[in-house]
Amino acid sequence: MSTEPNSPFVDDPLSAVDARILGSLVEKQATTPETYPLTLNALVLACNQKTSRDPVMNLTPGQVGQSLRQLEGRGLVRLVMGSRADRWEHTLGKGLELVAPQVALLGLLFLRGPQTLNELLTRSNRLHDFDDVEQIRHHLERLAGRGLAVHLERRAGQREERYMHLLGSQADLEAAVEAMGSDPERAAPAALSADAEARIAELETRLAALEERLARLEGGA
């Protein structure tokens, strides 16, 4: 791991649940703007998606709700009051003074852990239109300069270097690096093409919207 400035989150790190929530909000803002901001139920489903998530989680509404309240207190999410349901949106750009490309990259790192430049280029196609890996490297180095991301040197058996976010606890970050080292190329998360993952994620989002609509209808019956 290269030497970088200390993370501003070192004394009050994000939990794994916090990171999953923020990453999910960043993703859905870009991929399903018609349903964003998200209701609590929609956010739980987004956090627990089987695609584009590493690791896959099984969070409860209670866990997500508690984390949202903590993130709101830190100025990283905002509650949007609605006539039918309250909704949540992230405020990473304002809260951390980030430009859109940096928000997109942090979102991906929150959702999938350490990743190569090529992985980030492929997986970011629905979040931000990056020209090439060098543009991604530029924004990652800007994040690293503020202690929000770090460059990981290539390890034995790996073909490419990786980057990871630095907003989590030391234990979580070490676990992510260890998991990366135990299976250098981590074939399973990359087994699906980016297009296939996008289609599956879109179907999961549509299903979540239908379930939410059904719940509202049943509640009004």
Curated annotation (Swiss-Prot):
Tree of life domain: Bacteria
InterPro entries from the entry?
A: DUF480, WH-like_DNA-bd_sf, WH_DNA-bd_sf
**Pfam families per the record?**
DUF480 (PF04337)
Q: Where does the record place a coiled coil?
A: none
Entry similarity comment: Belongs to the UPF0502 family.
Name the chain's protein: UPF0502 protein PA3453
Source species: Pseudomonas aeruginosa (strain ATCC 15692 / DSM 22644 / CIP 104116 / JCM 14847 / LMG 12228 / 1C / PRS 101 / PAO1)
